[in-house]
């Protein structure tokens, strides 16, 4: 059994270089919600040195709200914005001897693409037109994953170690109780259940089936690094190989 571990980096949390020793995929902020050219270059350089798969983490242009405020934009604007951010990170990756392997939208763009076909198609079209060999990371069972596969992209279904789920498989909004899980033992057990048994218990009590192919480890918070170490150690102790997804692995559940 195999699983990818990913983290969102270049967002000013301070533990990026150390997290790259634990994850197999890095989603690097492209400057629109956090980060900037220097942060992007640092993260890319570290990822290349450590052999971690490089991914772009595009967002709405909304640094004031860390890219977490929902926006209603024309699909053409979303398409152009994603292309712009992919181009920036790709140039830096090329200069550092690496290349982008995947794309994972950030924040509100991620959540809206997960449920809105128009937004999903705009993001997918930008990725496909930029480089159809790129894999797409998205919420398991989401509209975004379906759109990516429909376009012929490798789709990697993502689950979250420390986020609450609703019965429809969507994440509990951060503004609501139960959105974030703070108990480390509960998160460890939940992660193992998602990876080995392909299910998660929703906030309302139902079991939700999902195809976990990559687990997001959040890098912010004072104990994030130590907790990431615990999650990786628990997975390896359970006999799970932690590896970056290839195109064939990505679509094994399609």
Curated annotation (Swiss-Prot):
Chemical reaction(s) catalysed: 5-oxo-L-proline + ATP + 2 H2O = L-glutamate + ADP + phosphate + H(+)
Q: Name one Pfam family in it.
A: LamB_YcsF
Source organism, top-level taxon? Bacteria
According to the UniProt entry, what is the EC number of this protein?
3.5.2.9
What keywords sit in the KW lines? ATP-binding, Hydrolase, Nucleotide-binding
Q: Which residues cross the membrane?
A: none
GO biological processes:
carbohydrate metabolic process
What the entry lists under InterPro entries is as follows: Glyco_hydro/deAcase_b/a-brl (IPR011330), LamB/YcsF/PxpA-like (IPR005501)
Q: What does this protein do?
A: Catalyzes the cleavage of 5-oxoproline to form L-glutamate coupled to the hydrolysis of ATP to ADP and inorganic phosphate.
Record-linked PANTHER family: 5-OXOPROLINASE SUBUNIT A, UNCHARACTERIZED PROTEIN YBGL-RELATED
Q: Family, per the entry?
A: Belongs to the LamB/PxpA family.
Provide the protein name.
Answer: 5-oxoprolinase subunit A
> Which species is the source of this protein?
Burkholderia orbicola (strain MC0-3)
